[in-house]
Amino acid sequence: MEQYQAYLELRRSRYQDILYPLFFRESIYGLAYGHESFFTENVDYNNKFSLLIXQRXSTRMYQQTHFSLCANDSNKNTFVGYNYNFDSQIILEGFGVVVEILFSLQLFISSLRGLEIVKSYQNLQSIHSIFPFFEDKLIYLNHKSDIRIPYPIHLEIXXXXXXXXXXXXXFFHLIRLFFYYYYNWNSLFPPKKRISTFFSKRNLRIFLFLYNLYVWEYESIFLFLRNKCSQLQLKHFLVFFERIFFYEKRKHLVEVSTKTCSYTLFFFKDTFIHYVRYKGKSILVLKNTPLLINKWKYYFIYLWQCHFDIWAGPGTIYINQLSQXSFHFLGYFLSXXXXXXXXXXXXXXXXXXXXXXXXXXXXXXXXXXXXXXXXXXXXXXXXXXXXXXXXXANFSDFDILDRFLRICRNFSHYYNGSAKKKSFYQIKYILRFSCIKTLARKHKSTVRTFLKKLSSEKLLEEFFTEEDLFSLIFPRTSFTLRGVYRGRIWYLDIFFRNDFVNHF
């Protein structure tokens, strides 16, 4: 193993040299369309791809080593071929595979060297730890900042970030030339679309890679600011140095006394700061004065403007107090509410009951997200009304019942941790009525006549009872413990969660 690690260490300085030749191999493009991406599912380009087409495109690319980019000779420039859209799509997919190979090699080498990534980030948590964090720590914090990660990022900045990760200069200049020649950055990233939709389907692999690279760069700087902000010293008039201009100011500092330098602003040294991100939104919560969270707001604005050349509008960051405002996150409507709890205190021989106010995180099922998810599954109309699913009318009665039961089960699992389930019960009624309408349409009858004829009302009630849905989560033997443990249970299916989150 040590010899193998030494071999990988030797190859570490050379593996970037293989990126440029890999870009011209047709087998890379076969991998692009034959295997799934690390970032998303496999994307098919209208089923027009074949290895022969990719081989011809790579052959043309390899033969034309000089690129004529003059304006007077624009008609003769055939860097890829006559079908620009299709050939450029093939090249983008190949580029996505090459950079994924690069980052997979980096992860593999890091894992053999003692899992440096895991050791460097001891506080790295999965998405499953978000809900315990909301219930255990969020109630003790008092300020929250809703952050919408801005876009689009300039192409040159994204290319510079990719160059820092890939040390192959030839490969970097080739893909940079290709981007500037064939594409307009504003057309790739429409400025008035949400982050979840501005990645076009035909370029999903490469765009997800570039966006994740941008987020990684942005959060790395944020982590640096978080770790170093409490170590900055002050001048004699107690002005806190901004991290963005810290190195410039340090050059012109006048030497002051040790006593003056020892002062620090205590409210900038905050250990209770938490950052949670999912897709294009993030939440920054902390426990301190409003001045600190306003400082962090301007940190983010200056970071986006100075480092990424992005104008952050006034609606990018919203600052609220947790006790006075609620927020949407991961399909839930969360708020920190104060609940009165009675505690028995024993003093000497007498016992007295004292009422204490305890903060609890109250989560409610969002009706808009639940209705939109049900409409996306063709189980309800867009106006949150029951509708007959025409696509399921050709199935058997059992398959139709099983389909609606599965949707209702997912809703029940996902919102089981919510305190108020009024919206969920409304969606449950819509699903039940849509199931009846679908069965009635299949048998060419009205809903009332169908229920009377087949006596299915009892069957549907059995399928959609709360007891039956709860038994799918816990075994029957655990029902006796329900009176002892009354804690809420969060459903942590990360794949099904996307159906709810995408509607925000």
UniProtKB/Swiss-Prot annotation:
UniProt subcellular location: Plastid, Chloroplast
One annotated GO biological process: RNA splicing
Superkingdom of origin: Eukaryota
Keywords on record: Chloroplast, mRNA processing, Plastid, RNA-binding, tRNA processing
Molecular function GO terms recorded: RNA binding
Gene Ontology annotations for the cellular component aspect, listed alphabetically: chloroplast
UniProt entry tagged with the keyword Plastid: yes
Matches recorded under InterPro entries: Domain_X (IPR024937), Maturase_MatK (IPR002866), Maturase_MatK_N (IPR024942)
Pfam families, A to Z: Intron_maturas2 (PF01348), MatK_N (PF01824)
Main subcellular location: plastid
PANTHER family linked to this entry: MATURASE K
HAMAP family, per the entry: MatK
Similarity comment: family membership: Belongs to the intron maturase 2 family. MatK subfamily.
Function: Usually encoded in the trnK tRNA gene intron. Probably assists in splicing its own and other chloroplast group II introns.
Name used for this protein in its record: Maturase K
Organism placement in taxonomy: Eukaryota, Viridiplantae, Streptophyta, Embryophyta, Tracheophyta
Gene name in the database record: matK
